[in-house]
């Protein structure tokens, strides 16, 4: 299945600034509008990566968003402001079709057959780190980064997923990623606790909660 990536839905591109030690390796940073993904992007900028922020539109932002939901119109604005603070480009990409076919439809099908599906796992596997990687390829990005609390370890047989902060561990949400996906994944918050993330947000001038 082919997907069309719609660049920038109504938001200006912010030019990135780097220091003399910037390594210049391009990274697509998934930005939900929350503090975790914003800090993850900020830490990568500090390390010298060429960071491109991306927020994924999973459904029409005119529809009412429930508490704790992602990708509402306010999330787009929060992500845009965080990207502007960090001095990086920001795009909103239309993944509504991919989300519906790979997450919603699968959830309904599994539920009808008596299974207990986890839509977050499917979303990360097929959309955030599946389809998003295609966008990374398109713009010449080597890695995709997220704000998950999980770690990656280098073993003799390749990359392995490991638990992050026990209180906030989110490695389960990435458990179905294939080795080739893990090899191109960056998890800047893997060794941090939530309080440390918030401290980094304050230091970076990020105002998201």
Per-region residue spans from a language model:
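A short, charged helix-loop
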Residues: 180-184
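Mid-to-C-terminal catalytic subdomains of enzymes
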Residues: 205-209
